[in-house]
Each structure stands twice: as structure tokens, then as C-alpha cells.
């Protein structure tokens, strides 16, 4: 199980422009919130909490076997 700080570090290595995240039951989604859009043109990634594995957002959200449960509201970092 990774911590939020570890997840932020992994995400920033992939794209240092990430400035917001949304927590889900089993993952964190990181993205660019530029005030107009919440993805900054499609730049988003998901990091699984259990494994620390970095996924493209499509792989996480399009997985019909996965139960997507949002935790709280989006947060800027």
C-alpha cells in the first residue's frame, strides 16, 4: 500500500504539471486543472493504492470489473 505522498511523487515523475488529484477507494487520479478543464487536454494518470502501479486513466475507468468509488472532492496540490 502506497501513501499519498508516494503517489504524488510517482505522478510528478510522469508529468510534473499535475496539480490536482481525485481519490478513489483503490486509487488516486492525477491531472492538470487549468481552471477551464479538469484534465488539461487529456493528461491524466491513475495510481493504484495497493501496488503503486501507474495506469493510463482509460485503463482504470474503462475496466468493467472494477468498482469505482470516489472519496471526497478533487484536491489541488
Question: Which residues fall in each region the model found?
Answer:
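N-terminal non-cleavable signal-anchor helices
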Residues: 5, 9, 47, 70-72
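Exposed beta-strand-loop-beta-strand "reactive/processing" segments of non-cytosolic proteins
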Residues: 16-50
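A generic structural signal for ordered secondary structure
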Residues: 8, 44, 57-59
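Short, non-transmembrane alpha-helical segments in secretory-pathway proteins
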Residues: 1-17
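Long, contiguous N-terminal structural blocks used for assembly/anchoring
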Residues: 1, 76-77
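A short, surface-exposed interaction/processing loop segment used at functional sites
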Residues: 50-76
Amino acid at each position: 500500500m502506497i501513501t499519498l505522498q508516494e503517489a504524488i511523487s510517482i505522478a510528478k515523475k510522469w508529468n510534473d504539471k499535475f496539480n490536482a488529484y481525485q481519490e478513489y477507494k483503490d486509487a488516486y487520479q492525477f491531472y492538470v486543472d487549468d481552471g477551464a478543464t479538469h484534465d488539461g487536454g487529456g493528461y491524466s494518470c491513475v495510481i493504484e493504492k495497493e501496488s503503486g502501479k501507474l495506469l493510463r486513466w482509460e485503463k482504470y475507468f474503462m475496466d468493467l470489473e472494477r468498482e469505482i468509488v470516489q472519496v471526497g472532492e478533487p484536491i489541488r496540490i
